[in-house]
Amino acid sequence: MTRLARHYVPEQPQHVILQGLTGPAFLDEGDYLYFLACLADAARVADLAVHAWVLMPEAVQFLVTPGYESSVAMAMQAVCRRYVETFNRRHGRRGAMWRGGYRATVIEPDRYFLLASQVIDHAPVRNRLVSEAGSYQWSSYTHHVGRRVDSFIKDHPLYAALGSTPLERQQAYCNLAAQPLDEGEVDNLMQSTLKGWVLGSAAYCEWAAQTANRRLMPLLLRDKPPKVRAARELTNVE
């Protein structure tokens, strides 16, 4: 069976997941820092705007906007190749690190962008690595609330619209992050990303289909609402 091309809709954000294959993908602070350096370099070369990120031992997630159709693939391939080679050399390992290729999907920004950003920033809490997002070093949460500047992050217009000043935006994001997430919408996001089908309203999908590089949903489900199962039953990524 021919593999479908990766989704691409011009100027639309994507949620991206890389899942670990066996064992933790990061063993020390140097690993985390090197992965971020690889990400920053690859994003610059591939014209990939990074809006949110999290690195966890078993998986990583990103919220990005590609500048062109191959931006995500180019960046992910460059990051994985460069990081895995160095990780294996540093720790005396060999072989693959990630479970297949990356998973990604286009999301409707007005409805899902800020949700996806919060899901990413709170993934360490949801995975019981920490009790609060602000205490986890390896995510974009502290950037979004003004405690740190991640120079490779490009703030999305929807984040910028949270306030007229950096302080207002940071406080507004902090207030949003304090609200409980809609678990149904979280499952929608995770399931859509893992399966590679666009996430958005019917109107958005109809609009996006005009410029997308492939069909946006399975043929059998095009006229039906997708059945949503809890993504946590299928993956440890939350």
Language model segments and positions:
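Short Pro-Cys-Gly-centered "Cys-loop" motif that presents a nucleophilic cysteine in a tight turn
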Residues: 1-56, 65-238
